[in-house]
Swiss-Prot record:
Heme keyword on record: no
UniProt biased composition (Basic and acidic residues): 1-12
Cross-referenced PANTHER family: EUKARYOTIC TRANSLATION INITIATION FACTOR, EUKARYOTIC TRANSLATION INITIATION FACTOR 2 SUBUNIT 2
Protein name in UniProt: Translation initiation factor 2 subunit beta
Native species: Natronomonas pharaonis (strain ATCC 35678 / DSM 2160 / CIP 103997 / JCM 8858 / NBRC 14720 / NCIMB 2260 / Gabara)
Designated gene of the protein: eif2b
Family statement drawn from the similarity comment of this UniProt entry: Belongs to the eIF-2-beta/eIF-5 family.
Region entry Disordered, spans: 1-32
Record note on quaternary structure: Heterotrimer composed of an alpha, a beta and a gamma chain.
InterPro entries listed in its UniProt record: IF2/IF5, TIF2_bsu_arc, Transl_init_fac_IF2/IF5_dom, Transl_init_fac_IF2/IF5_N, Transl_init_fac_IF2/IF5_Zn-bd
Length: 134
C-alpha cells in the first residue's frame, strides 16, 4: 500500500472533530423589563461560562450599551433603561469575540492578563498573546 492510499485510509478512519462552537456556547441572555430597568436574569451562569470577573463583563456592557448597571443581591445584572434581548446578546457576543476567544486558534481557553497597564489575552491552548478587546 502506497503513501497516498495510507493517507486516504487514515483520513477515512479518523473521526470528525467537532468545531469550537459545539464545545463553547454562551447561554442566551434571559432579560426582562422591571420598571425602567432591564434585568439580566442569567448573568451569573453567563459569567461562569465566560470564566471572567463579573465586574469586567458589567463594565463592558455598560460601555457597549451606554448605560449604568449594578448587580443585585440575587446576582442579576440590572441595566438602567430598556434593552431588547437581541441587543444584550449582541453585546455579549462582542465581549466573547474581544475578551474570550483566541484570535489565533479560535479556542476559548484564554486568560486576561495585564502587561504594562494593557489588557492582554493569553491563550492556554496555543500560547498566543494578543491585545484584548480587538
Amino acid at each position: 500500500m502506497g503513501y497516498e492510499e495510507q493517507l486516504d485510509r487514515a483520513l477515512e478512519e479518523t473521526p470528525d472533530i467537532e468545531g469550537t462552537a459545539a464545545r463553547f456556547s454562551v447561554p442566551d441572555p434571559d432579560v426582562r423589563q422591571e420598571g425602567n430597568a432591564t434585568v439580566y436574569e442569567n448573568f451569573q451562569p453567563t459569567i461562569d461560562r465566560l470564566d471572567r470577573e463579573e465586574s469586567h463583563v458589567m463594565k463592558f456592557l455598560q460601555n457597549e450599551l451606554g448605560t449604568s448597571a449594578n448587580i443585585d443581591e440575587r446576582g442579576r445584572l440590572r441595566l438602567t433603561g430598556e434593552f431588547r434581548q437581541a441587543r444584550v446578546e449582541e453585546a455579549i457576543n462582542d465581549y466573547v469575540e474581544g475578551y474570550v476567544i483566541c484570535p489565533e486558534c479560535g479556542l476559548p481557553d484564554t486568560r486576561l492578563e495585564k502587561e504594562n497597564g494593557a489588557e492582554v489575552l493569553r491563550c492556554e491552548a496555543c500560547g498566543a498573546r494578543s491585545p484584548a478587546g480587538n
